[in-house]
Amino acid sequence: MTKMLVLYYSSYGHIEAMAKAVANGAKQAGATVALKRVPELVPEAVARSSGYRLGQEAPIATVAELADYDAIVIGTPTRFGNMASQMKNFLDQTGGLWAENKLVGKVGSVFTSTGSQHGGQESTILSTHVVMLHLGMVIVGLPYSFKGQMRMDEITGGSPYGASTLAEDENHRDRSPSANELDGARFQGRHVAEVAAAMQLGRSHLQPELVR
């Protein structure tokens, strides 16, 4: 059975909601899913005064456990078109796994959130893809078979690079992920799980010396 990690960082709960949808989609495809988050770097007093969503129930992941999964789906909000520092700090600690090729051949995928429609969704996902490529992972996005990313009747996240959500409306008020955005996240989770399962099946028919 395919083992998937949905690894996320969420300040205000938008990515947390998307992460849960990704996990649910993967479970629909028969994957065993762990939903975990990376450590917070912001001091608790500052996070509390800034309205961060504290006490999220997902446990904290360890770097070493990344090698235990067949697929890793990362969720991070944007920070000026790049992943959040909390996620970058975590991934910067994977040097040991990189040196031993522990993540080579594993499926990787990314989803994100931004505060505006053009706030860096695609660049955030692509910058995270770069890390995955250095680790030898096989990248999977959100294919156009998810028709929700083609909608023109509403402002919505989602692109072929990955699911996404907008965290604010046009009046800069907090906005929860829409039904369409959550559908995209579930689709991505299911798609990643299916690709990872197919890769597992394919490897089972290879000669051992040809695997990775």
Curated annotation (Swiss-Prot):
Substrate binds at residue 98. Residues 4-192 form the Flavodoxin-like domain. FMN binds at residues 10-15, 78-80, 113-119, 134. Gene3D superfamilies: 3.40.50.360. GO terms for molecular function: flavin adenine dinucleotide binding; FMN binding; NAD binding; NADH:ubiquinone reductase (non-electrogenic) activity; NADP binding; NADPH dehydrogenase (quinone) activity. Keywords: Flavoprotein, FMN, NAD, NADP, Nucleotide-binding, Oxidoreductase, Plasmid. GO terms for cellular component: membrane. NAD(+) binds at residue 12. Its EC number is 1.6.5.2. It comes from the Bacteria. Coiled coil: none annotated. Binds 1 FMN per monomer. Residues 161-182 are annotated as: Disordered. PANTHER family: FLAVODOXIN-RELATED PROTEIN WRBA-RELATED, FLAVOPROTEIN-LIKE PROTEIN YCP4-RELATED. Belongs to the WrbA family. This is NAD(P)H dehydrogenase (quinone) 3.
